[in-house]
Curated annotation (Swiss-Prot):
It comes from the Eukaryota. One of its GO terms (cellular component) is microvillus membrane. It is found in: Cell projection, Microvillus membrane; Apical cell membrane. Its main location: membrane. Interacts (via extracellular domain) with PTPRH (via extracellular domain); the interaction dephosphorylates CEACAM20. Interacts (phosphorylated form) with SYK (via SH2 domains); the interaction further enhances CEACAM20 phosphorylation. Disulfide bonds join C72-C120, C259-C307, C358-C399. CDD domains: Ig. Residues 474-484 have a biased composition (Polar residues). This is Cell adhesion molecule CEACAM20. The gene is Ceacam20. Strongly expressed in the small intestine and colon (at protein level). Minimal expression in other tissues (at protein level). Highly expressed in cecum, colon, ileum, jejunum, and testis, and also detected at lower levels in salivary gland and thymus.
């Protein structure tokens, strides 16, 4: 571009010189001088330029170590020299230096960008001539080495590859000339390559390790080492969620879920009801997301829960886990049907059937027990059925719902009224009380009678024993000397307890004991012990039947049969009027 502009300016000067005589006439002296100078310049431009030569002190140099010196050889005078590099006008920098006449170009510190072709261009008037081309080769490198894997993913200082994939290794290092490669592999069974690339088919865990490549430049005598660490990722399999086997109770326990997997270099994600789980105050994750803790269990925390393990090449999710959270029982409800409303009072007809249902929300299912206020019987089951209502079925029925896992229980009651009962002045309870009272009174009466009878019998026996003793010692006052004829008419009495009329009592001669000393009347020994004593034994009283024979009985007899027939003691009983 510079040379083209230079030639354009020369032609402009010539055209202006040709036009000036026709448009403007200077003084004669000036015109003469101008014509003389123009003729002189024209003669000079027409003089041919000698051939140019370009030389360089060395065509091959080492970067940062050597310098390059170019020399433009020409004998022409009054010339202008321009330097051209790689077909472009050379732009000097701090590493380049020109001589005073511009014939010498020196590159003090050679860089790789200084490589290429160089020439010098000489301009003499309107004539331009170029020198020959000189090439400069700059040897450099190798630069820092980088090992690339086309099927891997960088994770920090590690490159991860999927198990079973084909992996291509490629070394990137700037160097001139082409360097030599020496590989150092983690496995001895891999043949070390001699180029900058090599391939492993179906990579496995055995191929993990450090891969090193030494790149050497034989010209610059420089070497650099490249290193890459390779990890082989397994294709992940589905994990499992582990949780405690203890019973989970609402508001009473917390639970920790663990995502169990055999893979080490994997990430873990949690899902709740198919959506990514968001941690909260009640849902907390460990540092590596391996465990999920649920604080203060609620009945809505049943899930399902899933955990997913993944790497950049594969992923797998666990089977959904649904928790069993025990709670309840909640409020107990008593109804007359499976889908009817809650009742507190029920009126039912006599002899009709009645079915009551007891229900309460509970996990596990609650246990139900029915009780009646007038009975100690306990019935199990959610349903209570009465086929025919009677009077005794009236009253309050209570249903108790209990949960054996949570240890909680609740109850509810309903009043059952039987309509159509027969009117009665007393209730069944009152009647039962009266019957029981009567039985108790009868028992008391029997006991009292037995007690009185026993007391009287004992008293009678003691009296009889006393009278018998007296009869053996004191003669009775009313012993009659009866004839045999009189003994056939009525029995003889030992004691006469019948009161006598006053006149008869006064007129009758009473037998009395003698006034002698008692020692003269009583004997110290019984008659049996002294048979020859002064006293004679008493005559034996003939035994008479209690009652005379039937047909021959005297109807006006004043004697009746005694109660105690076992005793031979009789008394006279005054007949009633």
């Amino acid at each position: 571009m510079e040379l083209a502009g230079f030639h354009c300016c020369s032609w402009t000067v010539i055209l202006l010189s040709a036009l000036l005589p026709t448009t403007w006439r200077p003084p004669a002296a000036a015109h003469f001088i101008h014509r003389a100078d123009l003729l002189s310049n024209t003669q000079m431009e027409r003089a041919p330029l000698a051939k140019l030569t370009l030389t360089v002190n060395q065509s091959t140099v080492t970067e940062q170590r050597e310098m390059a010196v170019f020399y433009c050889n020409t004998n022409a005078d009054n010339i202008t020299i321009h330097w051209v590099s790689n077909n472009s006008l050379l732009v000097l920098n701090e590493r380049m230096k020109l001589s005073a006449d511009n014939k010498t170009l020196t590159i003090l510190i050679v860089q790789r960008e200084d490589s290429g072709s160089y020439l010098c261009e000489v301009q003499h008037g309107f004539e331009v001539q170029r020198s020959n081309t000189a090439s400069l080769t700059v040897n450099y490198g190798p630069d820092p080495v980088s090992i690339k894997l086309d099927s891997g993913v960088a994770a920090g200082d590690v490159v991860e590859v999927m198990e079973g994939n084909t992996v291509n290794f490629r070394v990137e290092a700037q160097s001139s000339p082409v360097p030599a490669y020496a590989w150092y592999l983690p496995s001895d069974f891999i043949q070390p390559p001699t180029t900058g690339t090599f391939t492993i088919d179906a990579v496995s865990r055995e191929h993990e390790g450090m891969y090193r490549c030494l790149v050497s430049n034989p010209v610059t005598n420089l070497s650099r080492l490249g290193v890459v660490k390779v990890q082989v990722l397994e294709k992940v399999t589905a994990p499992n969620i582990e949780f405690p086997t203890l019973a989970l109770v609402e508001n009473a326990t917390s639970v920790t879920l663990t995502c169990k997997t055999s893979h080490q270099r994997v990430g873990v994600h949690w899902f709740l009801k198919g959506q990514p789980l968001r941690p909260s105050d009640r849902l907390t994750l460990s540092s590596q997301n391996r465990t999920l803790t649920i604080h203060g269990l609620q009945r809505d925390d049943i899930g399902p829960y899933e955990c997913e393990v993944w790497n950049w090449g594969s992923q797998a999710r666990s089977v959904p886990l649904k928790l069993t959270i025990n709670y309840g029982p909640d409020q107990v409800e008593i109804t007359q049907g499976p889908a009817s409303g809650v009742v507190s009072t029920i009126e039912a007809m006599l002899n009709s059937s009645l079915t009551l249902y007891c229900r309460a929300d509970s996990i596990p299912g609650a246990r139900y027990q029915w009780t009646h206020e007038h009975s100690s019987k306990v019935l199990d089951g959610e349903q209570l059925s009465i086929e025919a209502l009677r009077q005794e079925h009236q009253g309050i029925y209570s249903c108790t719902s209990s949960n054996d896992v949570t240890g909680l229980a609740r109850s509810a009651s309903v009043l059952v009224m039987v309509v159509g009962l027969q009117s009665s002045s007393m209730s069944p309870g009152a009647i039962a009380g009266i019957v029981i009272g009567i039985l108790v009174a009868i028992a008391l009466a029997i006991g009292l009678g037995y007690f009185l009878y026993s007391t009287k019998d004992r008293w009678t026996r003691r009296r009889s024993a006393s009278d018998t003793t007296s009869s053996n010692t004191i003669p009775p006052t009313s012993v009659m000397q009866s004839t045999p004829e009189s003994r056939h008419n009525k029995p003889m009495t030992v004691y006469d307890n019948t009161p006598k009329p006053e006149g008869e009592a006064r007129g009758k001669k009473m037998w009395s004991l003698p006034r002698d000393s008692p020692e003269q009347f009583y004997e110290k020994k019984p008659p049996s012990a002294a048979p020859e004593g002064p006293r004679k034994p008493l005559p034996q009283i003939p035994k008479q039947p209690l009652m005379p024979p039937g047909p021959g009985r005297n109807e006006e007899s004043n004697y009746e049969k005694l109660l105690n027939s076992n005793h031979s003691l009789y008394c006279k009983i005054t007949p009633s009027a």
